[in-house]
Amino acid sequence: MFTVFLLVVLATTVVSSTSGRRAFRGRNAAAKASGLVGLTDRRPECCSDPRCNSTHPELCGGRR
């Protein structure tokens, strides 16, 4: 859980350090990163579910 907190803080810092259009892209990247952090906590559930596994292969060792 502490790792999740650190990743969210890092993503927030990256977003706040950019400006203009780059900030918009950074927010999208931060949103994707925080979504993956949440999925990482549920990795066993996701890897055993074919729909989740096909949507997020990076969690289960699949190709990107």
Curated annotation (Swiss-Prot):
Alphabetized InterPro entries for the sequence: Conotoxin_a-typ, Conotoxin_a-typ_CS
The keyword Acyltransferase appears for this protein: no
Chain positions listed as propeptide in the UniProt record: 18-43
Keyword set, alphabetical order: Acetylcholine receptor inhibiting toxin, Amidation, Disulfide bond, Ion channel impairing toxin, Neurotoxin, Postsynaptic neurotoxin, Secreted, Signal, Toxin
SS bonds (residue pairs): C46-C52, C47-C60
Function noted in UniProt: Alpha-conotoxins act on postsynaptic membranes, they bind to the nicotinic acetylcholine receptors (nAChR) and thus inhibit them.
Protein name from the UniProt record: Alpha-conotoxin-like Ai1.2
Native species: Conus ammiralis
